[in-house]
C-alpha cells in the first residue's frame, strides 16, 4: 500500500515546503517585511527553492533558502528502515546582511532549528540536528550556511498518512 506519493522524497519535500511557508519569521526575513503569511507562496522560486540550485540570474539582494533531501535504506538484522537527511542552504547577499540589526543568516538558521530540530515535524520521528557549517556559494556576493538534519523513518509512516 502506498500513500499520497510513490516518491518518499516528494512526500518529505512537500512537508518541508509547507513548514517554511507557515513560519512568520522566515516569511518576514525573506520578503524583507513585504509579505504576510497569506502571501508566503510568492516566495517560492524567488527566495525559497526546493532543491540545491542557485540561479545565475539572481539580481536582487536579500536572503534565500534552498533545501533538498536524500534517503537511504538501512538494513540491520531483522530490521529495515529509511534514513532521510534534510539539507538547508541559507544564503544572504553581502549588501543586505542584516534584518532588524541581526544577521539574516543567523535569524533564518535559528528558525530552521526551531521548526525542524528535535521535532517530529514529519510525523514519523524526531529530526535530529546534525550540523551548521559555512557554505561557499561559489560567488563572493553571498554568505551562506549549510544546516543538516537527519530523520529515521522506522516504519515508513509518511506514506500511510491521509
Please place each PLM-identified region on the residue numbering:
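Small/polar-rich, solvent-exposed N-terminal microdomains that initiate assembly or binding
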Residues: 1-75, 162
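Hydrophobic beta-strand residues in large extracellular and virion-surface proteins
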Residues: 16, 20, 65-67, 86-88, ...
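Acidic-leaning, charged glycine-interspersed low-complexity segments
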Residues: 27-28, 58, 62, 103-162
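Generic short beta-strand segments
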Residues: 69-72, 91, 132, 151-152
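Exposed beta-sheet edge/beta-hairpin loop segments within beta-rich domains
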Residues: 73-74, 79, 137
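Oligomerization/assembly interface segments of phage tail-like spikes and tubes
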Residues: 80-96, 142-156
